[in-house]
Amino acid sequence: MDLQAQLEELKTKTQEALKQLNGDHSKELQELRVAVLGKRGTLTELLKGLKDLSNDLRPVVGKQVNELRDFLTQAFEEQAKVVEAAKIQAKLDSESIDVTLPGRQMKQGYRHVLTQISEEIEDIFLGMGFQIVDGFEVEKDYYNFERMNLPKDHPARDMQDTFYITEDILLRTHTSPVQARTLDQHDFSKGPLKMISPGRVFRRDTDDATHSHQFHQIEGLVVGKSISMGDLKGTLEMIIKKMFGKERKIRLRPSYFPFTEPSVEVDVSCFKCGGKGCNVCKKTGWIEILGAGMVHPSVLEMSGVNAQEYSGFAFGLGQERIAMLRYGINDIRGFYQGDSRFSKQFK
């Protein structure tokens, strides 16, 4: 059989072999390609016969060989696409999903109880015309202490153990620095300042059932003309009644805070026994809930506010304490352990 006839026969047999590889036969297709077009394949062996042809016939047959190589290369590429499509379809068929089956319910997350308490308190104050102001958790000693009427040699600094980063930079021990910064910027020609500053604060406490090295506070500040202790009492009564019920009463006890004068501790009538005395209120009928007072004139003066013309009141309450009292939680550490079973109770 001459070389041209062998080339034609190779073309015919290869086409027939390719037609048999319609399914997932990628391995067989590769083996056939190597057998026909590889370095030791049939076409390569036939090329060796060109040297035995006459000078007139060699170019003609050489062209035929090149055309056959191109034809077979394209045929293998097209068949490879067919085989790959068959492979994908077979995988889809084996991994088919019955869309009529019921889905698996995702586990539901829960808003943290402290988030709920914070948002509830913020909504109350927004309804009373207060603005919410955020501030820095890493604060300057100047704003955290000195602007709160606590100079470096003030003995009251011993009341708070502090996380210092440098000599003058610390983790804030209260959100009062936000009030000082806001007081600096407020334009009293546009009206009084009414604000709250919620956020995390940090103290060097040993963690136990009632203490934590970090906790949350919401501090409030109102400064304007003719602000009195009566305004403070009325504001606190409204907050307490909205938080703990309309039947709740408050009482003010004299206390001491460096940044307010006079200062008071605020108690709420026990919401468990109604003031009769129980284990929650320690048989007193009252529960300590927050601290407050009239803004110290020195604090106003340090912000450039004329203390003869303006006065104000400030207060601070802790979200953890409110949550513990409201829900009977006896260990503050439960707020920070990330246990969904704990959060689920307050959904």
Swiss-Prot record:
One of its GO terms (biological process) is phenylalanyl-tRNA aminoacylation. Binds 2 magnesium ions per tetramer. It is an enzyme of class 6 (ligase). GO terms for molecular function: ATP binding; catalytic activity, acting on a protein; magnesium ion binding; phenylalanine-tRNA ligase activity; transferase activity; tRNA binding. Mg(2+) binds at E261. The keyword Cytoplasm applies. Its EC number is 6.1.1.20. Pfam families: Phe_tRNA-synt_N, tRNA-synt_2d. Keywords: Aminoacyl-tRNA synthetase, ATP-binding, Cytoplasm, Ligase, Magnesium, Metal-binding, Nucleotide-binding, Protein biosynthesis. InterPro entries: aa-tRNA-synth_II, aa-tRNA-synth_II/BPL/LPL, Phe-tRNA-synth_IIc_asu, Phe-tRNA_ligase_II_N, Phe_tRNA_ligase_alpha1_bac, Phenylalanyl-tRNA_Synthase, tRNA-bd_arm. It catalyses: tRNA(Phe) + L-phenylalanine + ATP = L-phenylalanyl-tRNA(Phe) + AMP + diphosphate + H(+). Tetramer of two alpha and two beta subunits. This is Phenylalanine--tRNA ligase alpha subunit. It comes from Streptococcus equi subsp. zooepidemicus (strain MGCS10565). The lineage of its organism: Bacteria, Bacillati, Bacillota, Bacilli, Lactobacillales.
